[in-house]
């Protein structure tokens, strides 16, 4: 019903909506060989093709096929590659295996849209107008992960501020109170 095929659907035959596509196989060529899996409801759009070429995957469309439908395996594979975080070292035993623990995962989607916009404005990030919250959070998190940080200096400053019970926000509010008086 939702456009995704299930195991039940494949056992019982094609669902009513996918009846015209029955018997079609995936339109992709994977590593030089045509994919033999049955085509699902997902199509190989220009956007998907662009993301595949950017990731340098060994997938191409078979020109002899008259449809653009891909199998569920390739749909999930493309989605997983598209959603994977870029890492500085590769997963196949890169330079330092403990590097993955050094990069904390920060969920910037929890922030308000106005906060994300302020971040974008402060760092002058280039985006197209009219981004929704998810797109804005993705852009900001991509930038956030690439900011170089002097960890020792930052931690020392943080500890100093905690011990002295002060923060920049406290200083600003005190100076504004003095101006009002």
From Swiss-Prot:
GO terms for biological process: negative regulation of transcription by RNA polymerase II. It is found in: Nucleus, Nucleolus. A zinc finger (Atypical) spans 26-74. GO terms for cellular component: histone deacetylase complex; nucleolus. Residues 85-87 are annotated as: Important for DNA and phosphoinositide binding. Keywords: DNA-binding, Lipid-binding, Metal-binding, Nucleus, Repressor, Transcription, Transcription regulation, Zinc, Zinc-finger. GO terms for molecular function: DNA binding; histone binding; non-sequence-specific DNA binding, bending; nucleosome binding; phosphatidylinositol-3-phosphate binding; phosphatidylinositol-4-phosphate binding; phosphatidylinositol-5-phosphate binding; zinc ion binding. InterPro entries: His_deAcase_SAP30/SAP30L, SAP30_C_sf, SAP30_Sin3-bd, SAP30_zn-finger. Coiled coil: none annotated. A motif (Nuclear localization signal (NLS)) lies at residues 83-88. Residues 82-103 are annotated as: Disordered. Interacts with components of the histone deacetylase complex sin3a, hdac1 and hdac2. Binds histones and nucleosomes. Functions as a transcription repressor, probably via its interaction with histone deacetylase complexes. Involved in the functional recruitment of the class 1 Sin3-histone deacetylase complex (HDAC) to the nucleolus. Binds DNA, apparently without sequence-specificity, and bends bound double-stranded DNA. Binds phosphoinositol phosphates (phosphoinositol 3-phosphate, phosphoinositol 4-phosphate and phosphoinositol 5-phosphate) via the same basic sequence motif that mediates DNA binding and nuclear import. Belongs to the SAP30 family. PANTHER family: HISTONE DEACETYLASE COMPLEX SUBUNIT SAP30L, SAP30. The zinc-finger domain mediates direct interaction with DNA and phosphoinositol phosphates (phosphoinositol 3-phosphate, phosphoinositol 4-phosphate and phosphoinositol 5-phosphate). In vitro oxydation causes reversible disulfide bond formation between Cys residues in the zinc-finger domain and reversible loss of zinc ion binding. This is Histone deacetylase complex subunit SAP30L. It comes from Xenopus tropicalis (Western clawed frog). The lineage of its organism: Eukaryota, Metazoa, Chordata, Craniata, Vertebrata.
């Amino acid at each position: 019903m939702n456009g995704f095929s299930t195991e039940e659907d494949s056992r019982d035959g094609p669902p009513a909506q996918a009846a015209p596509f029955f018997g079609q196989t995936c339109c992709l060529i994977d590593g030089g060989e045509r994919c033999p899996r049955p085509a699902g409801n997902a199509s190989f759009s220009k956007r998907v093709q662009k993301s595949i070429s950017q990731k340098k995957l060994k997938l191409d469309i078979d020109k002899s096929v008259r449809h653009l439908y891909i199998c569920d395996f390739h749909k999930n594979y493309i989605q997983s590659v598209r959603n994977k975080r870029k890492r500085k070292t590769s997963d196949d035993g890169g330079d330092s295996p403990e590097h993955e623990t050094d990069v904390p995962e920060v969920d910037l989607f929890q922030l308000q849209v106005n906060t994300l916009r302020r971040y974008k404005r402060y760092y002058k990030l280039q985006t197209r107008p009219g981004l929704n919250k998810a797109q804005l959070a993705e852009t900001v998190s991509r930038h956030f992960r690439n900011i170089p940080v002097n960890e020792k200096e930052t931690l020392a400053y943080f500890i100093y501020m905690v011990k002295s019970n002060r923060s920049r926000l406290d200083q600003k509010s005190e100076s504004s109170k003095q101006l009002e008086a």
